[in-house]
Amino acid sequence: MRKVLFLLMGLPWLATAWGKDTTEVVVPFAYGNLDQWITREIHESAIIGGETKLLYEIGPTEKIVSNDAFTNKGGSPWANSNVMAKVAGVVKTNTSVYPEKRGDGMCARMETRFESVKVFGLLDIEVIAAGSIFLGQVHEPIKGTKNPQAMLQSGIEFTKRPKAIRFDYKTKLASSTNRVRSTGFSRKTTIPGRDSIAVILLLQKRWEDKEGNVYSKRVGTMVQRYIQSTDGWVNEATYPI
């Protein structure tokens, strides 16, 4: 199995500087230490095997046994790529983000992995599922593969002026020099070039005019890509915005 692992302690704070001095103010995100997780127990449809799957969400510690759509709990601003889909009445899940022990606390393990589904044990569909966490919400249940961005509400309101983002991380990338394309609707193909991992932060100023038109202007950007595995954890990595 081709797999890319990205172990991430969290995005627990933004480092900011105020005034003319260099005093650093650390502003944490709620649940950003990743020590609390919600476990969801989902029962998939019998037509695809009827398995019971676990999905994990960042938020106040709780276990939910239900196929109900999930919404953020306890004021958690976090969402991830663990989702429940319901297409033509068939319930299917994907789990590519997991809580994992790190020292006295927890971290998030994000995997890029193959997810397969068999219908009546005959039709085998395999797709690549990439693990990710982000600030915002997912509109469950997922009802199709068209326009995936419409299923996300990316970003949260942030009124401070951050100068940098800081987090701990650990990476393990696949050794292959090629990537695999597998959408489930066409044959699996190989694409030249190594895979990479990205952390992306966009700051936008948004406003609305009296006619109800919403505008946005980007005022800050941070993009960091990782193309090599790390030798253990990198602590307090700080990237300017």
Report the location of each language-model feature.
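Bacterial Sec-dependent N-terminal signal peptides
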Residues: 1-26
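Aromatic (Trp/Tyr/Phe) and Gly/Pro-enriched flexible surface segments
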Residues: 20-162, 166, 192-206, 210-241
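Residue-level detector of intrinsically disordered, flexible termini
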Residues: 14-16, 78, 173, 177
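A short secondary-structure junction signal
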Residues: 177-181, 212-213
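Intrinsically disordered, low-complexity domain-flanking/linker segments in eukaryotic proteins
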Residues: 182-187
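Extended, low-complexity, turn-rich repeat/linker tracts enriched in Gly/Pro/Ser/Thr and Asp/Glu
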Residues: 171-178, 189-194, 207-208
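Functionally constrained cores in energy, signaling, and assembly domains
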Residues: 13, 163, 171
